[in-house]
Amino acid sequence: MKKTNKRPDGRKFQKGGKPFRSDKGEGRGRMNNKKKGSVNAGLDRKVLVEPHPRFPGVYISRGKEDLLLTRNLVPGVSVYGEKRVAVDLEGMKVEYRVWNAYRSKLAAGIVCGAENIHMEPGSKVLYLGASSGTTVSHVSDIVGKDGVVYAVEFSERSGRDLINMSMKRPNIVPIIEDARYPSRYRMLVPIVDCIFSDVSQPDQTRIVALNAQYFLKEGGGVDVSIKANCVNSAVPAETVFADEVNILRKNSIRPKEQVTLEPFEKDHAMIIGRFKLSASEEKRQSSQKKD
């Protein structure tokens, strides 16, 4: 299993190590040089937007700052006050949303060097621990109109925000339920391509494994964001991560990568793997990487 604790290409997504700025909840203050609640969706000819080299549906803007982006599924609408960038693409205005790694564990995993998040246009994703939908909205952008995000959130308060957001995004299915009991929403979720989990519970790895048994296709992707202190605050973070990896292995999930999420999140790691990957399939994938 590959462990990563630095960005793969050495490029910075924030000059001077400064975070992207946003104006709500989990964010780190206001947007740079913008009043609270403002966005910038004007046509910017100085910004070059290019596809991310590893992740279909994810983009990078090259300008004064390098920013992680997703193409807005609902142009003209922001979800949580995020900055929007519009560029001219062959005579057509295309709008992108800035994806802040300080507000999204999945974005942090990408910036910190993950090689595969198992999501792309057309994917079906089961998202556990959806909260109010900040990261869910970007996954919605990634999978696009042909994909679906099944977003599970237990909190009724966050669930209301999630439902309101999903009204404008038809590819999100909000599920206000406890992820520890997947049988309660088994009639709503089909077989999916990937499970992403950001559930802050001591048994979060077991929760992921249980949902995988219900909903994840054979060979499907598993992305687990782990906060060490939520699992066991009495031992070092690396010990916690190693224990969680072993739990995944015992539940037919083969870890492939472990990515630390610092400096975006302290004592966090993302473990990325495959579910019930057969020996022949693993050999085929290994040979493809060598080629």
Swiss-Prot record:
Residues reported in the UniProt entry to bind S-adenosyl-L-methionine: 134-135, 153-154, 178-179, 198-201
Function: S-adenosyl-L-methionine-dependent methyltransferase that has the ability to methylate both RNAs and proteins. Involved in pre-rRNA processing. Utilizes the methyl donor S-adenosyl-L-methionine to catalyze the site-specific 2'-hydroxyl methylation of ribose moieties in pre-ribosomal RNA. Site specificity is provided by a guide RNA that base pairs with the substrate. Methylation occurs at a characteristic distance from the sequence involved in base pairing with the guide RNA.
Single GO cellular component term: nucleolus
Record PTM Asymmetric dimethylarginine, positions in chain: 28, 62
Protein's organism: Encephalitozoon cuniculi (strain GB-M1)
Quaternary state and interactors: Component of box C/D small nucleolar ribonucleoprotein (snoRNP) particles.
Catalytic activity: L-glutaminyl-[histone H2A] + S-adenosyl-L-methionine = N(5)-methyl-L-glutaminyl-[histone H2A] + S-adenosyl-L-homocysteine + H(+)
Protein name: rRNA 2'-O-methyltransferase fibrillarin
Key word RNA-binding present: yes
Gene Ontology process terms (BP): box C/D sno(s)RNA 3'-end processing
EC number assigned by the record: 2.1.1.-
Main location: nucleus
Gene name of the record: NOP1
Biased composition (Basic and acidic residues): 1-12, 20-29
Subcellular location(s) per record: Nucleus, Nucleolus
Protein's UniProt keywords contain RNA-binding: yes
SMART domains to which the protein is assigned, alphabetical: Fibrillarin
Keyword terms, alphabetized: Methylation, Methyltransferase, Nucleus, Ribonucleoprotein, RNA-binding, rRNA processing, S-adenosyl-L-methionine, Transferase
